[in-house]
Every structure is written in structure tokens, then in C-alpha cells.
Amino acid sequence: MKKTTIKVPLGIKYISEFKDLYNNIPTNGHYILNKKVCGCGATELYLGCDKKCILASPRKNLLYNKYSQHLSDNFHLFRYNGDKDKYFSNGSISSSETVTYKENLRDYIKNGGTKILITYDSIRHTHEILQDEKQDIEEWEVIVDEFQVMFYDCHFKATTEYEFYKHLQSFPNVVFLSATPFLEEYLDQLDFFKNMTMYELEWPRTMVEKPKVNMTNTSKTITKLCEGIIDKYRNGKGETTLVDGKEYRSKEAILYINSVKDIVKVIKALNINPEEVNIICSSTPENISKLKELSKAIGMEYKIGDIPGKGDTHKMFTFCTSTVYVGADFYSDNAYTYIFANPKVESLTIDVSVDIQQIIGRQRLDSNPFKNMATLYFNTKASDMTEEAFKKTLETGLMTY
């Protein structure tokens, strides 16, 4: 794979401000843009340009988050008809609903729409409609956001990822976006990627920093660990940090636990009421059922929540599963991040070189003094990796902005 380094000028915070970037990347063809850091505005660069653009994302949360930031910009979110609960539901979609969604997209294109937001599994419908409407495919650019997820999701969505990969070949212009540099060694083994050029952004050292991750090797249960965290925040004793000699205290905790079963167990054991907690997970029938059972057991209603928008009220505790590991934007000015990993439990296994960087990158506000901080709870005794090797891998892979 050929790699080209593009130096980002000093003072550039978002790449949409980097006016000379378009002179350094292709105007057509397939290529990879390794942005190196999260939160640098890569998708905004493409959504804000004059080109016809299809943003393909692996997660609905990411797409809705982006769509809600551009309500006045005439974007089309495929399969969204104004009913948010319906959009996030992971139940089966009837043939009549599919026809309606396709007709809505068809009308959007007929009326001159140029910005389409889709999940990976909708690329086939999008391509079909563009062809039906005699659109010049050369004029459309597909932006595959967080494309590393194509590989991670293969073990449970192999058909979806393969069909996405096949349909992408029907588009002459495709940009693969990622902040995950380690992918190179794997991409070189794949015919589809090995002949592409990877354009890698090189940021000035003063513009990036390594997150401050407090790594705690522990054999305690998730519930026991959460008990200490919940108690601290309820008593106004959240994490603190000093900035220019002034002490700041966190009043909100974001807890990344990729198991709704464990989240429910924590809420039940620690008597966390709905007013205190936001649960962000995939809207599957199984997860909905677990929250209904929790509601029945405690006598209060718990349901799947939303990512708060800019200016929205944040609850003291937010539990997140992997559905928001990538691409989602949180706008808290004081939230601190906690990450739980356990190699003995498949759902709690994380890739330290990818997932942690993505998770920490979810906090977007520079005014949050805890933006680049996190505590990682892990248990290397349950894996073949030593604690020293774990820490070295983590420190090598992390970079934030």
C-alpha cells in the first residue's frame, strides 16, 4: 500500500479549515484518509462541500447525531420519517416500509438533494435509486466513516459487510475514513485495499496530546467497581483535575460497559433511579425486554435513552454499550469517562489500540477539563497478556485532539 503524508499547518483545529487539503487528496477514485485523531471534523469537511455526497456509517447513533446537527441543511437520513423510536428500532422492516423509504429517497434526489446519510446495509438501495433516476454516479462521492468497523462487525454481520464491500465497487469515488493507523498491515492483505493510497494527516505536536488514562488492574466485579463510582458522584465527590491552578470537579460519569445485562445488574443493585441514569444501547428486542424486566422489578420505568444534543440536560450517570464507541458526539462540560474491560467476557473484550481512543474521542467540548481523561478497569490475569504489555500497547496506540 502506498502511503502519502499530508502535514496539517499549525493552528488548524478542524480539517475543514485546511483549505489546501483538497489540493493534496484525489478528486476521484478510491482512497483512504487516515485522519489520525478523533473529533477533527473529517465528515464535516465532506458534508460541507459542494459535491454530491453519501455518508455511510456503521452506527445509527452516529448518523442521527450528525443529521440532528444539520436540520436546516436539507440532509436526507435514509429510513428516518420523523419517528425517532422507529428509526432506532432494530426490528424487521416490512417490504411496504422499504418501499416508502426508497420513495422518500427518490423524491429527495428528484428535488435536487445532494447529501444522503445511510447505514452500511442501505448502500444497495441507494445505488439502485441513483441508477433509476439516471444520476451520474461519477458525480457522487461515498464517504465510508469509521470503515475499520467493517472488519470488527464481520463476525456477526458477515453478509452485510460483504454486500457493502461489493456494492462499494459500483461507485467510482469512495473515501474510507478512519483514525486507526494500525489497520495498514491488514489492509495490505486484501485485494480491494492493497492497491489504494492511504493519505495520512500529520498534525503538529502542539495540536495533539496523549489521553491521560488511569489504568486499574482489578479482579472486582463491575457492580462493585460501579458502587464506588456511583457513591462518589452522588456525594459530590466526582473526579477532580487542576487547570491553571484551578480545581474542577466532574459531576457526570460516562460508563462504557458493553453488556446490557451487567448495566441492568448495576442499576438494580445500586438503586439508580431513571432520573439519574441514561442508558444508551442498541434498540434490539432483547435489550428492550431487559429494560422492561428491570422496570417491572423496581417499579420505575427505564428505557433506552438518547445522546444529549448541544445544550441538552445531562444526567449524572450515562451507561454506554459499543453502539456509541465510534462517531457519537457528547457535549458535556464536565463528564468523566470510565471504561470496563474483561477478556473473559466476549462482549467486554476491547481492542486497546482502537476502542479506547474512539471512546475517549466521544467528548467534544474543549471546555470540559476531563475531555482527554479516562479510567480503564481491566483484568490481565484473565488473558495471555501481561499488565506491562497491555499498558505498552495502550500507550502506543493512543492519540487524541
Which residues does each predicted region cover?
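Post-DEXD/H (motif II) to motif III coupling segment of the RecA-like Helicase ATP-binding lobe
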Residues: 149-205
